[in-house]
């Protein structure tokens, strides 16, 4: 039996709080998108067979976690790495789900994600893989965390505090400039440590107000204009925390791209996803073509090459199919 697992990217709009002076640390917001996609296929095997270096590590860990002898895994397509779309989490969980399925095991995605090194700070990627939609996670008790990243497996994925179906006519502009990749690994850990050690708790209060007064009501009622403006403001306020680590409220060249998109009537809000360089714009089906044109214009005015696409929301989890 062969199994195929396909998952899409997620946008990460920012955190609710990065200060240890508040009761909860982190708490992230994001949405699941339908494209681009990562897809892996797997068959039973008595050992690990995988030519993709990163995926092979996940296959080995998955086999250990599930107590199975092996699997032959092929990566059919993958998300661009370290651009702010959550590629690492989606690949790791897709591999886990595929290996589990061919052996007739439950994947235990949420339980096993920490052992795969995923879901430590943000729970959006794991929740997006599970069920799609708009996700707001509860973060962690600040008393249990320090600025240091916990060892692999020594955490639980933040629980989902709120999830909503994203209206089917909403669209998300993706602008992926040809730029240096976003922070990851030890570099990301070092930057997050510096940010948490110095985070102004007052920003968390302002972000909380935006989330509760604008973002959550907007996604619940289908108000795309208020939602776009709200998540963009969450991103700007998060950028004040990160400015010293990424060279400004947005990392270059994301700021130039956001400026153009924010001046476009077809885009209700724009920002940087995670560490970038991916930039998003919130729009809808009717304005999608104009938003796409604005994305191309933004790249041209910034003097950089890149890719522009408009993605639909994904309100379901990863697709698992027996071939």
Regions picked out by a protein language model, each given a short descriptive name:
Residues 248-250, 254, 272-281:
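Small/polar glycine-rich anion-binding or flexible loop at a beta-alpha turn
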């Amino acid at each position: 039996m062969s199994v195929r697992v396909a998952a899409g990217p997620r946008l990460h709009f920012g955190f609710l709080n990065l200060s240890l002076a508040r009761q909860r640390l982190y708490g992230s917001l994001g949405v699941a998108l339908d494209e681009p996609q990562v897809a892996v296929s797997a068959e039973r095997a008595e050992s690990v067979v995988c030519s993709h270096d990163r995926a092979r590590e996940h296959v080995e860990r998955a086999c250990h976690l599930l107590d199975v002898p092996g699997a032959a895994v092929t990566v059919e397509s993958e998300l661009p790495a370290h651009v702010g779309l959550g590629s690492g989490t989606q690949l790791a969980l897709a591999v886990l789900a595929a290996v589990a399925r061919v052996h007739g095991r439950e994947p235990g995605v949420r339980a096993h994600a920490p052992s795969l090194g995923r879901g430590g700070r943000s729970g959006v990627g794991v929740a997006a893989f599970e069920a799609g939609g708009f996700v707001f996670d509860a973060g962690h008790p600040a008393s249990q965390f320090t600025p240091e990243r916990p060892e692999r497996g020594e955490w639980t994925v933040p629980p989902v505090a709120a999830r909503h179906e994203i209206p089917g006519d909403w669209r998300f502009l993706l602008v992926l400039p040809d730029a240096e990749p976003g922070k990851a690994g030890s570099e990301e850990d070092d930057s997050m440590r510096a940010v948490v050690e110095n985070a102004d708790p007052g920003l968390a209060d302002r972000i909380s107000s935006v989330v509760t007064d604008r973002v959550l009501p907007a996604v619940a009622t289908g108000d795309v204009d208020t939602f776009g403006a709200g998540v963009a403001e969450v991103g700007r306020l998060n950028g004040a925390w990160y400015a010293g680590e990424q060279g400004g409220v947005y990392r270059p060249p994301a700021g130039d791209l956001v400026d153009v998109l924010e001046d476009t009537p077809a885009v209700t809000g724009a920002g940087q996803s995670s560490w970038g360089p991916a930039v998003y714009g919130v729009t809808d089906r009717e304005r999608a073509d104009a938003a796409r044109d604005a994305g191309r214009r933004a790249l041209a005015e910034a003097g950089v090459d890149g890719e522009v696409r408009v993605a639909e929301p994904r309100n379901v989890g990863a697709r698992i199919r027996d071939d």
